[in-house]
Amino acid sequence: MIFSKNSQLILRHQKIFKNKIVFFSGNIEDELPINLLTIKTKIHLQKSQNFLKINNNKNITFYRKLLVSQDTVQDCNILIYYWPKNKSEARFQLFNILSFLPIKSEIFIVGSNSSGVKSAKLILEESIKLKKIDNANHSILMSGILINKTKFKLEKFFKIHIWKNLIIKSLPGVFGHKKIDEGSKFIASTFSEKINGKILDVGCGSGFLSVSILRKSPKCVVTMIDRKLSALESSKATLDANFFKGEVLSSNIYSNIFKKFNMIVSNPPLHDDLKINFDITKKIIFNSKKHLKKNGELRFVTNHCFSYDFYLKKVFSEFHIMKKDNKYKVYQAFLK
């Protein structure tokens, strides 16, 4: 079995964990959590991770929740945290976990240099004195003892943006957290009162696209999907803040979708962690046929320099670029 470079660093110290109750969290990259020898392992999943298959091992427990509770970690004595690409997301997750983890627990944080993992020392300086214990292949493993619990309130981590009288609420790590994405604004400028019926928002993030549609056409029935639990929480908060209603579901693209829609809308991510990845957009295109009604529409925004004509031709007989500028373009395709 091949493990990521971050997991390989942890494996070099596997003797430490043999007689411990270990809590895994963060940007878990592979199957190490279900293979590391421990007394008991708890795995905190905050997004869909297909490589981690739930098994029948009684010593392994999965928690698929945005937030950790006292009951989840009160018997744990080690945290292994995979640092994500986003520092504010790491701070959000760690402040939640460390507000409940027992004092004197051992904390292990692993991440690549390019992700900004070194900033963990400063972010957590009041709770842990982190020290580097190993490094290899541009990754670092740090550890320390929890000396002070953090203070955590979910509402304090929401960032609020206002756009055309809409309130957009976003948690750290959610796309468009620092500011509303310009590509999202660009596709939103194509929305009109003519949009109707059932709408599927793929990769909903903060819920910006859905509330932008509802602002123009409030009778639409929106379904918002994302693989990240922080995005789902943000979308719910955005709907509530604007007094709109919608269905918010956990789904890795279409994995949890079993009905058809009049329109699928998306601002697909171009990055998978720190790497550029076009696969998500391709999957949205190729599998949209299964989830569109007759004459249904797929509408998505992308960078001006990228072309998806080749892939759209394989699925749709009719498509065009409905709007473009020197940065973005919006594709519109119809299922005949």
From Swiss-Prot:
Protein name: Ribosomal RNA small subunit methyltransferase C
Gene designation per UniProt: rsmC
Class of enzymatic activity (EC top level): transferase
The EC number(s) this enzyme carries: 2.1.1.172
MF terms (GO), sorted A to Z: 16S rRNA (guanine(1207)-N(2))-methyltransferase activity
Disulfide bonds: none
Compartments where found: Cytoplasm
Pfam families membership: MTS (PF05175), MTS_N (PF08468)
Keyword Mitochondrion assigned: no
Oligomeric and partner information: Monomer.
